[in-house]
Structure formats: structure tokens, C-alpha cells
Amino acid sequence: MKKPLLIFATEGEAAPVRVARPDLDIAICGVGVVESAVSVAKIIESMCPEAVVLCGIAGAYSDALKVGDVVAVSEERCSTLPSVYRKSYLATIKLPLTEVVSNTVMAVGAEAMGAQIENMEGAAIFALCAAYGVPCAEIRTISNYTTDIREQWNIPAALEALVKAVNMLF
């Protein structure tokens, strides 16, 4: 894979990677499905990337994944719509990481739909990349369990693992 455009929801997630890898192209999409969809459409139209890799932190539904684990999302499921309208979106780039299914949610507490992790942007990015014909992948590091209160999240450990994964992959 040629050097992809790395997309992060927040500058806080991107900053450690920017410092470690100033040679990589990085963009910020914002948090949630609406903001990320609008931002990534503009990013794809203006930058015309050959590939996109969404990077960031995620919550795990069970302790089968540990805080700091790095995973590649193979499929995004969106639980925010009634079941008759739900779709799944697939990664089109394979990464040499443990693969998981992710649930894109707009609020904590949405049903897991058979997913191992949840995030707030993945389905939107996968759908946009498919619409534009841009190959895509998603890397997530586990910062918390979905039942944890915010004070229990370990964002520093997750970001450290994310930097290591980016260095290994790109």
C-alpha cells in the first residue's frame, strides 16, 4: 500500500502521531457520524487520497480485548438506525492486525450488534470511501470498556499503542 492519508476524529488522537511521524499525511474529521461524513467528503474531494486509514481510540464491549490492544476494523455496523435500514460497511484494505467488527454509535449504550468494539465515526468513513472508490482501513486502539466511566479510560496507553502501530504499518 502506498502512503495513505491518515484520518483522526480529534487533534488529541492525531498529535502523538504527528510528532512521531511528520512525514505522514494527516487530517482531522471531527467527532461523530455527521461531522466526520461532511469533513471526509471535503477531504477526499480536495486531497484525492489514494487510500484512507481511519485511526483512533475505541471502547471494547468485553474483556476479550485489553486496554492498549491494537485492532483492524474489518466491518463497521451502524446501530443508530432502525434495524430495517441498518447497513454494514467493509474495510477494503487488509492490515496485519487482529480483525474486529465495530459498531458505530451516536451514544453510549447502543446494542453491540455482534461487534467487539464501538466508535463514533467508522461507518461514515467506510461508506464515504466506498462511494468515492477510495480504498480504506481502520485502526483502533482500546482505551476503555464501554461500561467504564470516563475517569477509567486510559487514553495515554491507547495513544502510545496507536503510535507504535502506525510506525509498524507505515
Model-derived segments and spans:
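Glycine-rich phosphate- or other oxyanion-binding loops that anchor nucleotides, phosphorylated ligands
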Residues: 14-170
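Extreme N-terminal starter segment of soluble prokaryotic enzymes
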Residues: 1-5
